[in-house]
Amino acid sequence: MTQLRFALAQIDTCVGALDANAAKVLDYSRKAAAGNAQVVVFPEMTLTGYPIEDLALRRTFRQAAWDKANELATQLNDDVLGDLFV
């Protein structure tokens, strides 16, 4: 039977800091891959920070978060770290 190796990433994010939070996701993903993890699980709202409250009402922030998620997915793929599933 094939086994699947998971890594759980409990990281401290900052509300609204999309670039910094994405960098942490990349860093933890690299560390997990180095430890032979096949799946890395992050807490909800890792990219946007929690709670986003009023930021969620701003169309520009929602678009920026979407764009950053796509950029992060591309970077993960380029680094052969897999895909980003939300």
Report the location of each language-model feature:
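Hydrophobic structural segments
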Residues: M1-V86
